């Protein structure tokens, strides 16, 4: 069977489960947003990788999110492949822009959920500057 998307899926690579949950959290805090399109190539830290000085407040949110994920990777309890931030699923609720991580999450899921929650709330508090989307990474992120 062949699946065809009219939404430009060829532009968006398949996303691990946790990143899809992070996407949903951003949609909760910023209704009407398209996180996979808007944030995957923003500044120096939003999307894959990250280096240099963040270009603005939104990019700082992404750097803090990256740093948060780095902390969970250092926790020996969360070092198995099932617990890495990009694939570990967690439970949370969204109500009118408010995000709550479930008390039922295990230690690793709780940490990852809180990383994503903090970043999604941060995104909602800072401006999105179109000029920092798809910047020249090599020259501006040193």
UniProtKB/Swiss-Prot annotation:
One of its GO terms (molecular function) is phospholipid binding. It is found in: Secreted. Disulfide bonds join 28-94, 44-141, 46-62, 61-122, 68-115, 78-108, 101-113. Ca(2+) binds at residues 45, 47, 49, 66. It catalyses: a 1,2-diacyl-sn-glycero-3-phosphocholine + H2O = a 1-acyl-sn-glycero-3-phosphocholine + a fatty acid + H(+). Keywords: Calcium, Disulfide bond, Hydrolase, Lipid degradation, Lipid metabolism, Metal-binding, Secreted, Signal. It comes from the Eukaryota. Expressed by the venom gland. SUPFAM superfamilies: Phospholipase A2, PLA2. Binds 1 Ca(2+) ion. Its main location: secreted. Its cofactor is Ca(2+). Its EC number is 3.1.1.4. One of its GO terms (cellular component) is extracellular region. PLA2 catalyzes the calcium-dependent hydrolysis of the 2-acyl groups in 3-sn-phosphoglycerides. Belongs to the phospholipase A2 family. Group I subfamily. D49 sub-subfamily. This is Acidic phospholipase A2 KBf-grIB. It comes from Bungarus fasciatus (Banded krait).
């Amino acid at each position: 069977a062949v699946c065809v998307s009219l939404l430009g899926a060829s532009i968006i690579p398949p996303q691990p489960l946790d990143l899809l949950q992070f996407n949903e959290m951003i949609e909760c805090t910023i209704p009407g947003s398209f996180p996979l399109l808007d944030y995957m190539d923003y500044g120096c830290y939003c999307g894959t990788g990250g280096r240099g000085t963040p270009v603005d407040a939104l990019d700082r949110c992404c750097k803090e999110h990256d740093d948060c994920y780095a902390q969970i990777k250092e926790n020996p309890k969360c070092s198995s492949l099932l617990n890495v931030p990009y694939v570990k699923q967690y439970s949370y609720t969204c109500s009118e822009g408010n995000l709550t991580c479930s008390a039922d999450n295990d230690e690793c899921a709780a940490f990852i959920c809180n990383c994503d929650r903090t970043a999604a709330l941060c995104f909602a508090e800072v401006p999105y500057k179109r000029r920092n989307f798809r910047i020249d990474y090599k020259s501006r992120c040193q």
